[in-house]
Amino acid sequence: MKMLRNGYLLSSIALIALVLLLQVTPALADKNPNPGVLPPNSHPFGKTYEEWNAEWWQWFFSVPASKNPALATNGALDCSVGQSGHVWFLAGSFLTSGSFTRSCTVPVGKALFIPLINSWADNVCNTPPLTVDQLRASAASGVYPPSNLHASVDGQAFTDLRSYRSRSPVFSYTLPPSPDNVIDAAFGVSLPGPCWPSLTVTPAVADGFYIMLTPLSAGSHSINFGGSGPGITLDVTYNLTVGS
């Protein structure tokens, strides 16, 4: 955000973004135990955490496997791939437990939506198809019960992370053609295929624990997050350079 030296006033564009970001009632703001993280019942940029949950998965599936951060182990990334708007997404790891350290650059003024642990479910290859309630139960089984949920920025740990659980609305997602998509990369399944007739999948639902970080100041920052769910344990560190 740009501040004018002669009055320390936010620019009009930044002010609008700030108003959209802070759509939290004063009572909620007063009770927020985690300064720098928007409360789970807030509406960052006019959307609920649940809606951002769905958007995270749509972004994740849309990113080619060759550039997908959730398939990366360690090292430098291009965090701009598939990103747009006021909110950028960070990623954990797709179907793989472990500790990962990554680095990338994020523009000033971007809020960050981060999954501590998360899971999704859809009806691909399900015969007969599951109901939405059954899909929700399937997604929940990947993250609940959680343990060791953790998140911190520059060593400042956040608390009460179980309260940041988010269950998405029903959504659709679209994959790039094979071989450069996450399903082909993870399972060796060429798409479209016999039980996956379309690159666009619906219905899908997701469950997980997410935090929405308010924009970080320019400079270097370290973000650590992760946790354990049934069958997966993650500890992820992003060394970020926040710049123009």
Please state what every model-predicted region is.
Residues N53, W57-W59, H86-A91, A111-I117, ...:
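Ordered hydrophobic segments in well-structured contexts
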Residues S147-S220, G226-S244:
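Extended, well-structured beta-strand/loop surface patches
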Residues V24-A29:
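Sec/Tat signal peptide C-region and signal peptidase I cleavage site
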Residues K2-I13:
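Bacterial N-terminal signal peptides that target proteins for export
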Residues D78-S80, T105, V124, P194-W196:
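Sequence contexts marking disulfide-bonded cysteines in secreted/extracellular proteins
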Residues H86-A185:
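Extracellular-facing segments of soluble proteins and assemblies that are Gly/Ser/Thr-biased and enriched
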Residues S12-Q23:
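Bacterial N-terminal signal peptides
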Residues D30-H86, G227, I232-S244:
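N-terminal segment immediately downstream of the Sec signal-peptide cleavage site
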